């Protein structure tokens, strides 16, 4: 689960991280009211959407010469003018896709006198089985670009979970970020704080880009991105309250209600598969034969008829879907249950696109019989290769 920048900053501030004064606003009236309470004279107006690249983004409704989704203002009047221009508009960034995201809230905060911009993140390093700091002196830009062009400028430090962040760890991080004097003292306080927040709140990613050294020599968290482990949200009701459903795909929200692993993609062939590995293989072979998957959908190993029906409805709710491939290898999951769910769903929502079903494993003959006896226009397939070729051909011929 992702949260907005202003929510991430508030959370980190509760642990003691240094942030600027700021307030989230939802209207022009709120913007004017709260901007007057900030010290100024420099303000930053930030679009709040779940996507990066906001500063370089473009609003669909504005001209190509308009400013992006993060703007500086020299007065309260400029703040209000920017809010009026940005609020309710659709911001397109490299992470939103061409459809963009509507800006329903803005974050207004004090400006900062920046001396240097740094990069810092915490993540789970699966190669060593530890939480690791990833830092760089090249902040304020895409870390992927830094990794590609100047990988030597990235320093990774796995943390021993039994010891936590030690003074030696802090020293190594400070050295990597070239922190001195007041900034070094701030860093020695900040690193353990961030690690504690990451662990206690079950984060999957904590990214600060940039972490700045101000002209007065102190550190400040200038931007923050936080993601949480969905599997741990049951023990964090306070975090769940921060969820912004308007930022999520409605189909993914519906899938989560049925405990389905669903990710919307941009292709035309809907996929319903059991098992993440088989789901990825299914998407790969669809691409191999010249088409694109419309989604990743894993119904899991013990799905019921109702769960399968819900999964089918979610797939058919996507207007981009021109064909559906059901690929089931029954182990724990029984093929007859899948077949009953597919038949029930098709009868309920109708079938307006080609449907290919490949079943193998437990109760496969019963499953095939259920589909054959249903009278539905379903294309059977013998194996994965056969299934992929048939659905791609059906979609291209439609």
UniProtKB/Swiss-Prot annotation:
ATP binds at residues 46, 53-55, 109, 112, 117. Mg(2+) binds at residues 209, 223. Binds 1 Mg(2+) ion per subunit. Pfam families: ATP-grasp_2, Ligase_CoA. One of its GO terms (cellular component) is cytosol. Its cofactor is Mg(2+). Substrate binds at residues 274, 331-333. It comes from the Bacteria. Residues 9-254 form the ATP-grasp domain. Heterotetramer of two alpha and two beta subunits. Belongs to the succinate/malate CoA ligase beta subunit family. Succinyl-CoA synthetase functions in the citric acid cycle (TCA), coupling the hydrolysis of succinyl-CoA to the synthesis of either ATP or GTP and thus represents the only step of substrate-level phosphorylation in the TCA. The beta subunit provides nucleotide specificity of the enzyme and binds the substrate succinate, while the binding sites for coenzyme A and phosphate are found in the alpha subunit. This is Succinate--CoA ligase [ADP-forming] subunit beta. It comes from Bartonella tribocorum (strain CIP 105476 / IBS 506). The lineage of its organism: Bacteria, Pseudomonadati, Pseudomonadota, Alphaproteobacteria, Hyphomicrobiales.
